[in-house]
Amino acid sequence: FGKRIKELREGKGLFLREIGAALELDNAFISKVENEERLLPRKHLEKLAEFLNVPLQELLILWLVDKIKSIIEDEETGRQALKFVLKDLSK
């Protein structure tokens, strides 16, 4: 998610401070999001999608991937749990 945000921002010639101002977040936090040290709160996704002129669904999918990874990556049985979730969702 963060890498894609940085890619979009740089592609549009925008500065961190411009995204920060649009989302009412400080530059340091946006930098941590781009460097994948923090996850942007979900409530900011719609405004970010509008600001960057990208489909909300694109950002939401990437955001969910990172959110899920952050939950299970430190769990010894995370992959197994994810398999059960996928199986359950396919019912």
What kind of region is each of these model predictions?
Residues 1-11:
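A short, Lys/Arg-rich alpha-helix, primarily the initiator
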Residues 5, 16, 27, 42-45:
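Helix-turn-helix DNA-binding elements, focusing on the entry/boundary residues of the two helices
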Residues 9, 20, 49:
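The alpha-helix within a helix-turn-helix
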Residues 13-32:
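Short alpha-helical DNA-recognition segment
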Residues 24, 41-58:
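DNA major-groove recognition helix of helix-turn-helix/homeodomain DNA-binding modules
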Residues 60-91:
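Interfacial/linker helices and their anchor residues that mediate assembly or domain coupling
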